[in-house]
Amino acid sequence: MEEQKPKGSGMEKIATFIVDKRNLFFLLYAFALIFSIVATGWVKVENDITTYLPEDTETRQGLTVMNDNFVTYGTARVMVSNVTYETAENICSDLESIDGVTSVDFDDTTDHYKSASALFSVTFDGTTTDDISVHALHTIRDMLAGYDTYIDTEVGVDTSADLQSEMSVILVLAAIVIVLVLTLTSRSYAEVPVLIMTFGAAALLNMGTNFLCGTISFISNSVTVILQLALAIDYAIILCHRFSDEHETKDTREACIAALSKAIPEISSSSLTTISGLGALAFMHFGIGRDMATVLIKAILFSLLSVFTLMPGLLMVFSKKIDATRHKNLIPKITFLGKFDVATRFIVPPIFAVVVVVTAVLANKCPYCYSYTDLVTAKQSESQIAHQKIKNTFGVNNMVAVIVPTGDYDSERQLLKDLDSRAEVKSTQGLANIDAMDGYKLADALTPRQMSELAGLDYEVAEALYAAYAVDQNEYGKLISGLGDYKVPLFDMFMFLQREMKDGNITLDGDIQETLDDLFEQLNKAQLQLQSDKYSRLVVYLNLPEESDETMDFLDTMHALIAKYYSSDTYIVGNSTNVKDLSSSFGEDNLLISVLSALFVVIILLFTFKSAGLPVLLIVVIQGSIWINFSVPTIQHESLYFLGYLIVNSIQMGANIDYAIVISSHYSDLKKEMRPKEAIIAALNEAFPTIFTSGTILAVAGALIGVMTTNPVIAAIGTCLGRGTVISIVLVMAVLPQILLIGDTIVERTSFDVKVPVDLSRVNRTASGNMRVSGRVRGYVNGVIDAEIKGTLNGTLNASVTSGTTIEPTKPDFYLPESKEQAAAEWAENYTEGEEV
């Protein structure tokens, strides 16, 4: 045979470079993976979901002010059941004696003793992460080991570490399922390690580059690996199957090059819907969406990179093993389902329409919640069990902090009084209402005479102390007019006295000094928690749940009460205000994600199928699956954490739509060769292995996350994702085929095509003799052909065909005028490469 060597296309050149330079890529990946292993330790994880609230929300602003100005000591609610009150009193004394415990609140009221159960409110000497608090908590656990004890606290709780431990177990179980699924759907057992290594590299690269994002959320840190696997495993499978097909007629290298050059555009196109769905998350006002979109899209891109640059080399290395371990197709044909779909094509769509309308209404009434404190997960941690036990016995403990400008004790006192008078308030605490001694409060203003009587000082000593205070505050007028009526808040005077004693300006007798030292220690802790140079913090305990309409209304009432005394620079901070801020932005975020994810996908499908009708049909099916998915919580009367809806909505639209695309693509191709009814049956058989692989992995991953994690946010995402994927699979297999059959007319009438002029420069090869041809050929062939043909023939066919081959008249892509056909044929026959066209 004589043949001029062709010039490869741009994609073929890229594929050739990747395959031929595979050892270079292996080396680069080795360095990159080593770096990623090290860099995973650099990733900072944010466990506080309120960090991602918009900057203009009250909760976000209030938390910033509170964290910058106050210290919040660790606390614990310790419930001991089946004890007498006398035993409880002894336990209280033992708890107070523990090093690291500041105070223990316990009395005989029903707030602390009920139904033979005692509730101790413990305050520690340090914050929730300080060693002194953690050690004290361990001591409490050891001390109460013999009792029926429940401890609800955030002290020593590392949410990120606990979640990572749970996700590691989930990942192992998911990996086992994935290996089984890949084994069933693979064509060779040796393909499985290639797929696993490709994905493992992509996952590690993504984790190792998360530090570039600065700080990522605990949600992204925990679920990305599993979602990356479930969403991107298809890419590796596509290339693997392409290689298997090409390897039947080509040697390993040529097969790998051909497979990669064809797979790159196919896989890239497939990934666009997933990326667009995830991209919609980035437009959320709630910053967690941007965080997840960044990490997950990065994961998809690394998956593409690994499939395009690492997997070809692995296929070359494992090619002999792949050939040696080939097995028969283990996935059965589902012709029976296809026949069912054909038979019910006029029955199922109307039923589906009714179901969609009903579930859309139910989904719109889904009982969303914005606080996960009281959510019950399938698997519960010790802390969650304790929280529920204490809640069921003693009720809720809903605390909010009111932050106001400092310096006006009278306004603080009056505000606390107004709040205490409300039935919705259990108790309040602030410097203005903390008892000092002899009936005085810490913020009460005393004259020198009152101070001398209270502290047991000589009047002259008290007067001298007041004079020194007046000088320190630059209030010289008081010295001139006389100090008899000069009033100073008790707290301010004690803090001034402490400073003067530290500076050595004042010395006292030993007994008084020791008493004051103990007092100063308590006052210092009170100040750190309740007062700074700019703000005062008032603590309010509500008789209301964290999340209810009544609670939201009372927050408005609190704002009105605060406005009576302060005109600006005030904040209310707590789980309830967090709920209020999240719920106010949810409606807009929900609409934004639903519209954008659907819009992005429609645009991609529009140019993929070149039909305005088909994308609408596919979107209707997937949107229907979303509505059905989120109607379930309404039917079950179970609260759904709002993030579960927002995140799964975008993933379901971006990822599950691929199942519908696979069936539609096969159907569109096959109906050119056979009748629509036969085409849809064949399309289901061809698409089922892909849908089974991807769908099973995503559904199992979601289900495992939902039932095996104790974190309510992650569990909500997993449960909704697993359920939504199963629903999507059922609909695309048992509803979409009928819709495609009866919607053919709509698809055809709304189809369009981009007119591309005939590119005669493609007629640039001539060859004669025996030859093997692989790829698309357009032109004139004169000779005997022995091949599998799938395409359009414009001319005369005289050949033997195998059973099952269909030959039907069809409209060619373009026509040459009859007068031009012979001239074109003669020109092509005499054309030589390089000749000017």
Task: Place the predicted regions along the sequence by residue.
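Structural signature of multi-pass, alpha-helical inner-membrane proteins
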Residues: 2-4, 8-30, 37-41, 56, ...
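Juxtamembrane segments of multi-pass membrane proteins
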Residues: 52-54, 58, 69-75, 83, ...
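A short beta-strand structural signal in non-transmembrane regions
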Residues: 74-82, 92, 107-164, 398-406, ...
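Membrane-embedded transmembrane helical bundles of large multi-pass transporters/channels
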Residues: 1-47, 101, 128-371, 546, ...
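Acidic/glycine-enriched edge-of-secondary-structure segments
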Residues: 43-57, 367-380, 498-513
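Generic recognition of flexible, low-complexity loop/linker segments
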Residues: 65, 387-391, 414-418, 522-528, ...
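A structural signal for short secondary-structure junctions
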Residues: 393-397, 423, 519-520, 528-534, ...
